[in-house]
Design a protein with these regions (language model features):
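Glycine-rich beta-strand-to-loop/alpha-helix junction loops that act as flexible
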Residues: 135, 206-210, 230
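Low-complexity, intrinsically disordered or signal/transmembrane-proximal segments
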Residues: 292-295, 300-301, 309
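Glycine-rich beta-to-alpha transition loops that act as phosphate-gripper elements at the mouths
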Residues: 24, 81-87, 203-214
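Alpha/beta enzyme core
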Residues: 5-9, 27-51, 59-76, 88-200, ...
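Short hydrophobic targeting helices and cationic amphipathic motifs
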Residues: 304-313, 318
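C-terminal alpha-helical cap/extension of soluble enzyme domains
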Residues: 213-293
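Short, conserved beta-strand segments within well-ordered enzyme catalytic domains
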Residues: 21-23, 43-47, 80-82
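N-terminal amphipathic alpha-helix/helix-capping segment at the start of soluble metabolic enzymes
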Residues: 1-20, 67
């Protein structure tokens, strides 16, 4: 059963460790990450970008696939299904589709508009039992074709967003999506310290976890980071393993062209990457019970949600 990411991240923040968000792109990605999390007895957050959601034919398909896979694989560790860098409209669609957590990325809006939209989504997400992540200070690099220069967040703006009742906050501190260039200056810990002072005990999120040195990761955790996102590293390991399989001609041996065999090395490479991350301090897991959302409670949430927010759904073309 899917759970909100709120409790797992609050416990990570208090325990000074971090939970990993690994983005999924298809069935192989999802299966590999879930099986590895179960093997390691570790909670996990499955991130889904809007581009990946579209690739998998829509958020409803993603939610159904993940929920069914959790059941069929007998996954018992806490799993959150989380929209990554969601638009205002995308957040509504994921709420309706059955996600258990959403991220609204309003960092490209003027702060006043970011506050207004975040405030509305907080009320709706919480009415449905979902956790909500917000962002201040755009993350650099490329995400689904959108290239951001990256900037450091304003601690005062972080406090304004945090005070809206969000569950965790992504603050730009010099981190970027994708591969880090050779001239990257590293994480800005002065900004992170000031953000921590401004938002108190709120769990912080570090996007662009691929390629950040372990010592920086550990320091970031000591300053309040409780969720670290990884996507590019899994993609690179999948591509390298698949390339090796083809270059060695294994796809031409027997029925090596069968997709179940062709994609297997890449799937195993994803497992190895997730294990590697879970083996570091930043993904240390303590065996804690995470509250799950019961079906009866979900029905109650949905009734309340429809009563209070029908006009918002109608306005966004979701009814």
């Amino acid at each position: 059963m899917l759970v909100s990411a709120k409790e797992m991240l609050e416990k990570a923040r208090a325990g000074k460790y971090a939970v990993g968000q690994f983005n999924i792109n298809n069935l192989e990605w999802t299966k590999s990450i879930l099986l590895t999390a179960q093997e390691l007895n570790s909670p996990v957050i499955l991130g889904v970008s809007e581009g990946a959601g579209k690739y998998m034919t829509g958020f409803k398909t993603v939610a159904a696939m993940v929920s069914a896979m959790i059941d069929e694989l007998n996954i018992t560790v806490p799993v959150a299904l989380h929209l990554d860098h969601g638009t205002y409209e995308g957040c509504y669609k994921c709420i309706k589709a059955g996600f258990s957590s959403i991220m609204f990325d309003g960092s490209h809006y003027p702060i006043e508009e970011n506050i207004d939209k975040t405030k509305e989504l907080v009320k709706i997400a919480h009415a449905m039992g979902l956790s909500l992540e917000a962002e201040v200070g755009s993350i650099g690099g490329e995400e689904d074709g959108v290239v951001g220069m990256g900037e450091c967040a304003d601690p005062n703006e972080c406090k304004a967003i945090a005070d809206l009742g969000i569950d965790f906050l992504a603050a730009g501190i010099g981190n970027i999506h994708g591969k880090y260039p050779a001239n990257w200056q590293g994480l800005n810990f002065e900004v992170l310290e000031n953000v921590k002072k401004a938002v108190g005990d709120m769990p912080l999120v570090l996007h662009g976890g691929t390629g950040i040195p372990a010592d920086m990761i550990k320091k970031a955790i000591s300053l309040g980071v409780a969720k670290i996102n990884v996507n590019t590293e899994c993609q690179l390991s999948f591509a390298a393993a698949t390339r090796k399989y083809v270059e060695e001609g294994k796809d031409l041996q027997g029925k090596g062209f069968d997709p179940r065999k062709l994609l297997a090395p890449g799937a195993e490479a994803i497992k190895a990457t997730v294990k590697e991350k879970n083996g570091t301090v930043w993904l240390r897991w303590q065996s804690l019970k995470i509250k799950q959302i019961s079906q009866n409670k979900l029905v109650q949430y949905k009734i309340l949600f429809l009563k209070n927010h029908f006009s918002n759904f109608k306005r966004n073309g979701l009814f």
